[in-house]
Amino acid sequence: MSSAAEPPPPPPPESAPSKPAASIASGGSNSSNKGGPEGVAAQAVASAASAGPADAEMEEIFDDASPGKQKEIQEPDPTYEEKMQTDRANRFEYLLKQTELFAHFIQPAAQKTPTSPLKMKPGRPRIKKDEKQNLLSVGDYRHRRTEQEEDEELLTESSKATNVCTRFEDSPSYVKWGKLRDYQVRGLNWLISLYENGINGILADEMGLGKTLQTISLLGYMKHYRNIPGPHMVLVPKSTLHNWMSEFKRWVPTLRSVCLIGDKEQRAAFVRDVLLPGEWDVCVTSYEMLIKEKSVFKKFNWRYLVIDEAHRIKNEKSKLSEIVREFKTTNRLLLTGTPLQNNLHELWSLLNFLLPDVFNSADDFDSWFDTNNCLGDQKLVERLHMVLRPFLLRRIKADVEKSLPPKKEVKIYVGLSKMQREWYTRILMKDIDILNSAGKMDKMRLLNILMQLRKCCNHPYLFDGAEPGPPYTTDMHLVTNSGKMVVLDKLLPKLKEQGSRVLIFSQMTRVLDILEDYCMWRNYEYCRLDGQTPHDERQDSINAYNEPNSTKFVFMLSTRAGGLGINLATADVVILYDSDWNPQVDLQAMDRAHRIGQTKTVRVFRFITDNTVEERIVERAEMKLRLDSIVIQQGRLVDQNLNKIGKDEMLQMIRHGATHVFASKESEITDEDIDGILERGAKKTAEMNEKLSKMGESSLRNFTMDTESSVYNFEGEDYREKQKIAFTEWIEPPKRERKANYAVDAYFREALRVSEPKAPKAPRPPKQPNVQDFQFFPPRLFELLEKEILFYRKTIGYKVPRNPELPNAAQAQKEEQLKIDEAESLNDEELEEKEKLLTQGFTNWNKRDFNQFIKANEKWGRDDIENIAREVEGKTPEEVIEYSAVFWERCNELQDIEKIMAQIERGEARIQRRISIKKALDTKIGRYKAPFHQLRISYGTNKGKNYTEEEDRFLICMLHKLGFDKENVYDELRQCIRNSPQFRFDWFLKSRTAMELQRRCNTLITLIERENMELEEKEKAEKKKRGPKPSTQKRKMDGAPDGRGRKKKLKL
């Protein structure tokens, strides 16, 4: 630290310690103060007295907190008012010294004239007498001074010169757990300079550079060097509450921090027992808690209001933005890793919160930086830089954190599975009029189509009815029916073998449900975090994943809930299962691992489904990401209308790849190994990055970005022009196919013919009986029919053609021709035998009856002849029994016997699965006398976060009671949950659909089967350990009981 800051300087006049009767904002310490906020109860009582009837409940709390104190209206805090006036004067003077540009904003704000420069009349503005004096004190030295004025100015300058700004050269002594890095010390000095000049600011360092630590260091400086311990408020996302609290205790333990979180009763107790007594310096709370307890927080004069992830207030009309603007604050600080996500108006919203007296008009700001009229103006860019320079500090990892390895992103392009293509086609066909620009293009309709297509790209099981069942099983079909899951199933074993640990992000929590089933099936230990995860469980999962030598391999997170403020630097691989519309959200997700403390190169794998809407979404996000860096790093301006996705652009996204999907119904998934997939993805990623860099160079030179052209121009085609002639284009839907029955051998015989001309069919007698193989005529009949056909060919002089496809074509032709030449006609006995044999088959069984018989065998199993007979319509049980006996005896005579047997065996496997599940449930339930109260489930390390054990117990016991194999059992189970008083207020369980209950029960059954198997193996091991039992004869000789239960007397 510099010499000027070695002894802690005395507090300046504006932050002098206040008397005990002063407001909380004083933050000073004296003989009656213990270092925390003082006068909290007195001020709260006074505020409650003036609040009115609406605050009656809060008045009671205040009365409890300060018994015996008389309610009286407290006078405005003179220290607070003095600090605000001094800061305002210092702020204007500081800004005008930075650049005269701020006179444009400051003078209109002081004069209260029309805010838009277009409405201001030319000429010298009129200034009121009292306002003129204020402006003169700000920096107008051109008028003639009196001697008294000059003396006052010299005294003021002298007093300012004695207050040297504190500047640290090394990590402050009050920072205990470690030392600040060089760039963090510079950031702390910048924050201190803002405070000294009465300026609020934005700390916009890239995610992972320690904005939390720099903020805590600033609050520590306020306490140790300015004697202002608080009260300070830190407003953070719910997911980062615990992290902020632990960071306070770790880095600056002398700061007393408290956390407001909980239900209504817990919050009331916190306000009464913790907040009002004032034994604290910093209050950390979430956005939601702030909104609920705004009436309490408004009663404080906050010294510092810090908002983490400040883009939450980018919309000045949101409820959170309006509430925080109502608070009394001396200083404000915004923290964000993404200072500009969309447009300049959002930047104005942040600046207006920081300095409302400077940036008081959005119209003025928008006119001053008119992106429509001034694009390409170099002076305008310089003007923007000058405006941002005093308020905003942004560093990126590549510039300041040399020890942090750069992250490497690879886009992995995957194909659609057969099921995905069917669902994708179905979604497009439902709105084919939109694709061909014939229907009404409603924006909500287009957004819904986009959402459905994105669900299809992730996994078809996200649609109700897509997953095969019941019963629902967790096995290979979970992987093979999604292209992304196929790649994931190849990638994870490779990463585990390399010793990596993985974060998987997805937009959809139901995708996390599928991934959870997959991890349980593959025995990957995992953690999960989404928007429904309770606060305590969130932190438990983070701690379990980050602890040394943790066995957790996968951490699955929803992008919105798990992408903010969480430190998961113990992972080195990030998998983006799907991409967000806003690329900043994906960047935040990546930086959960790519942050200070990371020692490995972070690899990011972004899954993109090829030739689908996902390609367009990622391309648009890449464009938006480049535009985001323009204002902050490169100085270019973003058109405000650019980031609004229009109907035409959405339509182009939907149309992209539609023709390709319609062209085939087969799967695009290949057996390519993971190394080949990664190599191909890296190559394609490099090509896309090169294309984007070339696309932006001309715009960078001219400080423009023709983003409309950039979005619509792709692969050399202007999609705006294509939209104009959309009516001439037509995406042809797939042809409807007529279903037909084919003989398998004839099909393959025709399909295998390549280019040779078809040989003429061998002639048959004109009156040939229609004989089907499933009618099981006697084999002798087929011999007689063959003899009759050969003789007919002989009579017409038929010559067998040579078949070039056969290996011994000449020999085969000779043998077949010899049969014809030696053929004889049927004699009278053979004709009579033929007629008799034609009556011995199952002539009354047609193809429909045969198909019903096969399906019944598949449904009930070959041994359940009673139920099979009921399934075959128009046949008596005796007829079915007779046919079944012949079928299983002579089934090998059928042409497609392999296909039929596979169908029946699949059905029998399902039956056996149902039996094994029923047996497992019977075994589990049988261990308890009162299973609805006593049953315990062995979750192991993979307990889900959504369902409680009480809910799981009820599901299993009620499923067993209703009957697992009963039809519509899950609909009945859902009704039982709704009727049960036990779950009267369990809205989560009561809102589950039948399919969601099936999936949960399937997971529980898997756990029960695993538990039963482990118990059986344990019992076998114990029996083996005890050794074989003694033989019966030996026991009887030793006096063992006989068959009647008595011991035989031994004769001596």
From Swiss-Prot:
Compositionally biased intervals (Low complexity): 16-55
Official protein name in the record: SWI/SNF-related matrix-associated actin-dependent regulator of chromatin subfamily A member 5
Biased composition (Basic and acidic residues): 69-83, 1035-1044
Domain Helicase ATP-binding: 192-357
Annotated GO MF terms: ATP binding; ATP hydrolysis activity; ATP-dependent chromatin remodeler activity; chromatin binding; DNA binding; helicase activity; histone octamer slider activity; nucleosome array spacer activity
Compositional bias ranges of the Basic residues kind: 1023-1034
N6-acetyllysine modified-residue sites: 440
Organism this protein belongs to: Homo sapiens
Residues given in the record as ATP binding sites: 205-212
InterPro entries (alphabetical): Helicase_ATP-bd, Helicase_C-like, Homeodomain-like_sf, ISWI_HAND-dom, ISWI_HAND-dom_sf, P-loop_NTPase, SANT/Myb, SANT_dom
EC identifiers of the protein: 3.6.4.-
Record has Acetylation as a keyword: yes
N-acetylserine modified-residue sites: 2
Motif (DEAH box): 308-311
PANTHER family tied to this protein: CHROMODOMAIN-HELICASE-DNA-BINDING PROTEIN 3-RELATED-RELATED, SWI_SNF RELATED, MATRIX ASSOCIATED, ACTIN DEPENDENT REGULATOR OF CHROMATIN, SUBFAMILY A, MEMBER 5
Reaction equations catalysed: ATP + H2O = ADP + phosphate + H(+)
Segments for region (Disordered): 1-83, 1015-1052
Single GO biological process annotation from the record: heterochromatin formation
Function comment: ATPase that possesses intrinsic ATP-dependent nucleosome-remodeling activity. Catalytic subunit of ISWI chromatin-remodeling complexes, which form ordered nucleosome arrays on chromatin and facilitate access to DNA during DNA-templated processes such as DNA replication, transcription, and repair; this may require intact histone H4 tails. Within the ISWI chromatin-remodeling complexes, slides edge- and center-positioned histone octamers away from their original location on the DNA template.
